Regions:
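Glycine-rich ThDP/TPP pyrophosphate-binding loop and its adjacent helix/strand module
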Residues: 2-119
Length: 119
């Protein structure tokens, strides 16, 4: 965890003419390499990278204070894209139980219906 953004920063630095996109999760933000990367992007003035945070409010072990995380991310990189994702939209996935739940075919169909209804 936390290595995708470092690779993305390296790619953006190696080829300033290419747009690079990076996605990190809120749980991944516990890694120091994420914060070092965000700081480097800001301090170096790197313009060819776009960082997105998928914030569902959970790490693998505990809930995350998403409001605090968003403020902290914006302090490190004001242009960061912060996406709050809904974790209770699927009735069979609840909080940390979702990590260990084995989906059935019916669950997949329900999930597809939930996603289709959002379009």
């Amino acid at each position: 965890m936390g290595q995708g953004i470092t690779v993305a920063v390296g790619r953006a630095a190696a080829n300033p003419d290419r747009k690079v996109y990076a996605m990190v999760s809120d749980g991944e933000c516990a890694e120091g390499s994420v914060w070092e990367s965000l700081r480097y992007i800001q301090v170096s003035g790197m313009k060819n990278i776009e960082v997105h945070v998928n914030a569902n409010g959970w790490a693998c072990y505990d809930p995350i204070d998403v409001d605090y995380l968003e403020r902290r991310c914006k302090a490190f990189l004001p242009d960061i894209k912060f996406h709050r994702t809904v974790t209770n939209q699927f009735p069979f996935l609840k909080d940390l139980d979702a990590h260990y739940y084995k989906m059935t075919l019916e669950d997949y169909q329900t999930g597809l219906e939930c996603v289709d209804n959002e379009r």
